[in-house]
């Protein structure tokens, strides 16, 4: 059975999928058996045959040169670009933890280092109906995963990143580190954001990703040690 790491973002559109692709690519280029899994994906676009295409999973599969079929990489796919709980309700396909856990465990059995990507931020609702209330952090906790946070380097990131760290700690979920995305070297505000986040949380920023980067600048042993 392999090791796993969960990737969350401080919100939507912070570049979580982009960074996840770089992480899996880094592992695989180092000769390691690195894989990808996502429980639920919304906003999928149909192809010419009407089949929904899970864009995030397809992107990581392409960037990291993953050979597994796309059906192994994501469990629930919805066309609406909504929060998963709403997309699931509209399509009458509620997210079932038992099915997610089964697919997750299968993915772990196939990969030595499995990177699981979340949906939106850590408090994203996955299911909210008369039978069950399940947020993304519930899923992470029940799967016993540590979390790596992807944060936008720009204005507003101090608040979002510190709140994400504090929420994870309140839920007793291990925080493995932070990756700063959309970083501009020499930008005084972004550098101050990084310093303030590290001082306020005690969590290290492990890598800085610039726009257009095709490689993740992080020591491979450090990256491997984030997985458990």
Regions found by a protein language model. Give the residues of each.
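Conserved glycine(s) of the Walker
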Residues: 14-15
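Histidine-anchored nucleotide/phosphate-binding helix
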Residues: 24-28, 136-140, 159-169
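C-terminal lobe/tail of nucleotide-utilizing enzymes
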Residues: 165-228
